[in-house]
Structures are given as structure tokens and as C-alpha cells.
């Protein structure tokens, strides 16, 4: 009897703990859009980067960190693969659906394009089928014609999955193209943001019932 109870208790402890954690919601997205609408995207005199560009980078970091928190908790055994995918879907629906009207339409459209690699890489990581030879992958990606979007994204997502798994990328591969980056370079820039986010989440974990 006691042995059976111990086995049941042990099995229960082995199950991923369920969390009441809000990773990203529509209100958070809307607040960022409102802030960006009020920002000035023209650099002040003597400045190279405008207030709006700085905010846009922080916006990207916020989304990237929120998404990778989900994956990090999966790595910690807090979520099953199915739960992780469902939570990624929820955030992706907010981030990748629709565009604001006016001046921000093109800016947010470009942001959404760069964030394609974030969500695709996370799913590839969860599937577990990805190459870890970063150097070879970058070389392959840079050789793909920009019109071949799907193939380029597949390679970039492979790099991103390797980064989520612990590989380091991609500062040394983007420094030469930072002034005029192509789409694959934009994805490498986002993967660099992912790399930094994963480092910051090295000790991240949440207890059941905690919220953001």
C-alpha cells in the first residue's frame, strides 16, 4: 500500500508542473504599438539612432524574450511539447497577425518578417531535427537567392534552433552587413537577439501560480 502511494507520488512529481504564466497578450502588444506611434523615428542632431529605432529594438527584444521563456520552461520540464507549441501559437497569433495603419505599417511589417525566424526556429528546436554546424549553415544561407524565401528561412531557422539548444551565433557573421542587411542578415540579427536572450534566461524558471 505504502509502496503504491510512493509510486503514485513519484509519478505525479515527474509530470511537468502546470503554470499560470502570461507570456504575452494583446494588451502588451497594443501598448508597444501606441508607444511607437508617439516615437520620433528621425535621429536628433548629433545622434545616429533615433528614439523610435531604439524603442523598436526594445520591442523586438521584449517579444523574443517572451517567446523564449516558453521554450526555456519546456527545457526545464514545466511544459510538455504540446503545451509549448500551443503557447507559441498564442503569442504568434498576436505578433504576426495584422498591421497598424499609418506610418508604422511598413515598420511593423518588416519587424514581423524578421520575427518569422524566431517562431520557426522554436518549432524546429521542439521537433529535434536540426544541424548544429553554424558556420556551414551561415555560408549556405548567404548563398541562397533572396527570392527563395522558404529555403533561406529553413536554413536560418536551423541556426536559430541550434542557438536555442545552446550554440552561439551570430555577431561575427553580421558585422559586415549591418548598414545594408539583406533578409538573411536580418534573420541572423534576430538570431543574435535570441542568443543573448537565451543567455539571460540561463537560470530562468517559474513556480506554479506565478505570473508575469
Predicted features and spans:
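Leu/Val/Ala/Ile-rich N-terminal alpha-helices, chiefly Sec-type signal peptides and the beginnings
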Residues: 2-75
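Extended alpha-helical scaffolding modules
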Residues: 13-25, 30, 36, 109, ...
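Short amphipathic alpha-helical segments that mediate assembly, nucleic-acid/protein binding
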Residues: 13-16, 29, 66-67, 81, ...
Amino acid at each position: 500500500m505504502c509502496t503504491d502511494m510512493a509510486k503514485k507520488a513519484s509519478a505525479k512529481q515527474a509530470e511537468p508542473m502546470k503554470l499560470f504564466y502570461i507570456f504575452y497578450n494583446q494588451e502588451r502588444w497594443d501598448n508597444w504599438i501606441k508607444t511607437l506611434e508617439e516615437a520620433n523615428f528621425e535621429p536628433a542632431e548629433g545622434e545616429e539612432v533615433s528614439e523610435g529605432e531604439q524603442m523598436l529594438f526594445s520591442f523586438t527584444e521584449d517579444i523574443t524574450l517572451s517567446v523564449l521563456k516558453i521554450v526555456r520552461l519546456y527545457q526545464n520540464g514545466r511544459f510538455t511539447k504540446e503545451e509549448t507549441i500551443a503557447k507559441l501559437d498564442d503569442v504568434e497569433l498576436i505578433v504576426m497577425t495584422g498591421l497598424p495603419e499609418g506610418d508604422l505599417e511598413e515598420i511593423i511589417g518588416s519587424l514581423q518578417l524578421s520575427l518569422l525566424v524566431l517562431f520557426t526556429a522554436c518549432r524546429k528546436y521542439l521537433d529535434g531535427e536540426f544541424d548544429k554546424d553554424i558556420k556551414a549553415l551561415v555560408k549556405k544561407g548567404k548563398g541562397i537567392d533572396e527570392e527563395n524565401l522558404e529555403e533561406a528561412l529553413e536554413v536560418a531557422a536551423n541556426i536559430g534552433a541550434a542557438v536555442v539548444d545552446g550554440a552561439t551565433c551570430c555577431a561575427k557573421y553580421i558585422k559586415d552587413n549591418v548598414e545594408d542587411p539583406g533578409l538573411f542578415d536580418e534573420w541572423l540579427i534576430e538570431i543574435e537577439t535570441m542568443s543573448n536572450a537565451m543567455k539571460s534566461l540561463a537560470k530562468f524558471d517559474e513556480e506554479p501560480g506565478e505570473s508575469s
